[in-house]
Amino acid sequence: MDQNNSLPPYAQGLASPQGAMTPGIPIFSPMMPYGTGLTPQPIQNTNSLSILEEQQRQQQQQQQQQQQQQQQQQQQQQQQQQQQQQQQQQQQQQQAVAAAAVQQSTSQQATQGTSGQAPQLFHSQTLTTAPLPGTTPLYPSPMTPMTPITPATPASESSGIVPQLQNIVSTVNLGCKLDLKTIALRARNAEYNPKRFAAVIMRIREPRTTALIFSSGKMVCTGAKSEEQSRLAARKYARVVQKLGFPAKFLDFKIQNMVGSCDVKFPIRLEGLVLTHQQFSSYEPELFPGLIYRMIKPRIVLLIFVSGKVVLTGAKVRAEIYEAFENIYPILKGFRKTT
């Protein structure tokens, strides 16, 4: 049998010598990859431009979204700031109203005191102005603004306790410039360290007081137990400065602060007191063990401790300390701790 006849018809032409155009290079192979051979194939280009455009569009969309989010956040911040400003304005209005009410109540108490009537105590939460005609009241009935609250002990009842003066601070002007180094070197019981404090610290034993002497001629005297002792001590300090050769005078003597203390002899519920008198008192036991009560009239600051000890400060005259204690004693008795 002929070799060409044994091949299939479609392969007879390829196997014949006439069909072989170039020896050694196959014309067709089923394993040959696409695009190889004699016939050149067109190169297929990918759409790289369209991919870049899509990426740019996505980036633009992301940027727009971020800008929108930032605008929303800015709007929210502006709204919060507006709300805070409104709240601050409301608080200022409330404080102004409360201050006006306090002044009104103090003036009423002063007029009652001059007329011979016992002063009335008011609840701390009722110290507001009365509502104007045509407006709704701030507090529902039966609690109306300026409603007097009767304490557990009448205000007219005397406590029988007299606060004792513990310290008096006074000032005086010596009327001349002073050389503090000379005073510190030549005077007894005097110390001067300008790096720590710009004044000479001088002490005397009778009365046992301490003076702060400044180069401007001003002097502060502390530690006296009475007004007379404070004046006497200030004169002694001025005399010491005179003996050192300075033309010291004794001008404008004035008592700046008086501190008194007493004991009511019973424990006090400070938590209940601060809740009832929130406007006048503050109590932070983690910072300070005493309750700080700021009285309006007289303008005295009281330190009230749970043991019953009371410290009064800020008075200019002795009578203010006595008056402040007589005002606070009925309130303290109303918050007496029962064991």
UniProtKB/Swiss-Prot annotation:
Question: Which residues are connected by disulfide bridges in this protein?
Answer: none
Please list the residue ranges covered by the sequence repeats.
165-241, 255-332
What tissues is it present in? Widely expressed, with levels highest in the testis and ovary.
Q: Where in the cell is it found?
A: Nucleus
Positions of DNA binding = 167, 203, 218, 257, 294
Q: Which BP terms does GO give this entry?
A: DNA-templated transcription initiation; mRNA transcription by RNA polymerase II; positive regulation of transcription initiation by RNA polymerase II; RNA polymerase II preinitiation complex assembly; spermatogenesis; transcription by RNA polymerase II; transcription by RNA polymerase III; transcription initiation at RNA polymerase II promoter
Listed A to Z, the keywords are: Disease variant, DNA-binding, Host-virus interaction, Neurodegeneration, Nucleus, Repeat, Spinocerebellar ataxia, Transcription, Transcription regulation
**Pfam families in the record:** TBP (PF00352)
Bias class Low complexity marks the residues at: 57-71, 127-138, 146-156
Position of the signal peptide? none
Give one GO molecular function term. RNA polymerase II cis-regulatory region sequence-specific DNA binding
Renumbered to this chain, region (Disordered) spans 1-21, 36-71, 127-159
- What does the sequence similarity comment in the record state about its family? Belongs to the TBP family.
Q: Which disease is it linked to?
A: Spinocerebellar ataxia 17: Spinocerebellar ataxia is a clinically and genetically heterogeneous group of cerebellar disorders. Patients show progressive incoordination of gait and often poor coordination of hands, speech and eye movements, due to degeneration of the cerebellum with variable involvement of the brainstem and spinal cord. SCA17 is an autosomal dominant cerebellar ataxia (ADCA) characterized by widespread cerebral and cerebellar atrophy, dementia and extrapyramidal signs. The molecular defect in SCA17 is the expansion of a CAG repeat in the coding region of TBP.
Q: How does it assemble?
A: Binds DNA as monomer. Component of the TFIID basal transcription factor complex, composed of TATA-box-binding protein TBP, and a number of TBP-associated factors (TAFs), including TAF1, TAF2, TAF3, TAF4, TAF5, TAF6, TAF7, TAF8, TAF9, TAF10, TAF11, TAF12 and TAF13. Part of a TFIID-containing RNA polymerase II pre-initiation complex that is composed of TBP and at least GTF2A1, GTF2A2, GTF2E1, GTF2E2, GTF2F1, GTF2H2, GTF2H3, GTF2H4, GTF2H5, GTF2B, TCEA1, ERCC2, ERCC3, TAF1, TAF2, TAF3, TAF4, TAF5, TAF6, TAF7, TAF8, TAF9, TAF10, TAF11, TAF12 and TAF13. (Microbial infection) Interacts with HIV-1 Tat.
- Stated name of the protein: TATA-box-binding protein
